[in-house]
Amino acid sequence: MKMAAARWAAMVVAAGLLAALVLLPTDLLPPARAALAIFGIAVILWTTTRLDAAWVAFAAAVALVPLQAADQRELMAMLGHNIIWLMAGAFVIGAAIQSSGLAARITGGIAAKARTTAQLFWLTTLALIPLTFLIPSTSGRAAAALPALALLPDDGADPRRRAFALLIPVVILVATSAALTGAGSHLLAQDLLDQRLGERFGFANWALWGLPFALASSALACAIILRMFLTADQRAAPIEVRAATDRPALSSGEWRVMVVAAATFALWFTTDLHGLEIATVAILAMIALTAPGIGVMSFKAGMKAVNWSLILFVGGAMLLGQALINTQAAGWLVDQLFTLVGIGGGSAAALPEIAVIAAIALISTASHLFLTSHVARTAALGPPFILMAQSAGIEPMAVLFIATMGMNYCLTLPACSKALLLFQDAPGGGFRPGDLLRLSALLAPLNLALMIVTYFAWWKWTGLAL
């Protein structure tokens, strides 16, 4: 009852603030006010209720039309956007990799080489990173990695298993930054950039910028978990060796999936050479993997593997972000939001580079505390970040990419990710919510600092200079 009352109180306060927000700016036209109001209502529902986040986003997108903040053609075009079909194809590719056993082979094969607990943790971290390119869903990657828990005892008394149950989802989440297809929010960020500036990150560029950061943040998380939750003796404790020879040879299905996946990644990395969009390549891969006699699953099974709820969530969020920009509501919002931290109204141009990077990193990293969805964070903060960059005369692509790296951080509460919930309640014992809070208290500021270091050591020199 107390929690319900607190939730209702939060909704009332938020609604009051929203009403003031919409009524106060007298210089906004009605469509901009409508877009701002719908956006505010969506954020309130995302943060204070248990309503399905995808339903909220989709309903918000539909509500834009009668209020003239978007037109019907934009709504229909949303459902046929190339990002929608890129995600659909990526889900089928991920399902094929997972169902064929290839994902488990990758993680299990590397982890089987471990002789001590510390080696197991480091090798598992290394094995999980490639899954970011293979399976587009964090919960899908978590499900594929769940069997790895069997490498440690499940008697409930071994702290190594508890730490291991924490390590796997944490690495899955921080490694999300490695690939453009690692999360739907990345594709949404690319669409926002395309809408505003006609620019795209591209699969290869994202890997160039995101993979080094993902490797560094994954290594940082592994090192902290080993030191924070295990003693030196526990880290050096031997584990039972699962020899790689115990695993069967590659099946014909695994071979077919490997060939299709390799061809897909090769085409994604060479888009500029052949001209095929990454969404088109994903659809071709989807057709190949579900083709009779060639694929490893039926077309019907492939469609069931697609997370249509997430896809509609991304579609609704895209239209919401587009409406904020087109109606000029985002321009007003960005001045209010970023003025609070000293980078609004173009003032970022006068600040030291390190101060701007730190402000972007702080805002984006902290956003997971009030918006638990990757896509919701990008929909809410993506347009303001782009407009802040434009008003300050700094590079929008760099600002949005760095902000996306910060928005990928979501490790404070289990509710922030299905991957965390899966390992918290893992059969045989998982981690405790307090473990995650302890970890995040140290990892969050270090991850923020890592973003700043990565900018000056790598991003700035590889095409992401402000």
Where does each model-flagged region fall?
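Juxtamembrane and boundary regions of transmembrane helices in multi-pass small-molecule transporters
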Residues: 2-25, 158-162, 166, 174-248, ...
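Helix-loop-helix module between adjacent transmembrane segments
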Residues: 7, 14, 90-97, 115, ...
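Alpha-helical transmembrane segments
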Residues: 7-19, 57, 118, 122-127, ...
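Membrane-interfacial loop-to-helix junctions in multi-pass transporters
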Residues: 9-10, 31-34, 80-84, 110-126, ...
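Structural signature of hydrophobic alpha-helical transmembrane segments
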Residues: 22-37, 80-92, 139-141, 213-216, ...
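Flexible hinge motifs at transmembrane-helix junctions and intramembrane kinks/re-entrant loops
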Residues: 26-33, 40-58, 75, 223, ...
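Core transmembrane alpha-helical segments of multi-pass membrane transporters/permeases
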Residues: 55, 74-104, 129-134, 300-335, ...
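Hydrophobic transmembrane alpha-helices that form the pore/transport pathway of multi-pass ion
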Residues: 111-178, 184-197, 370-406, 429
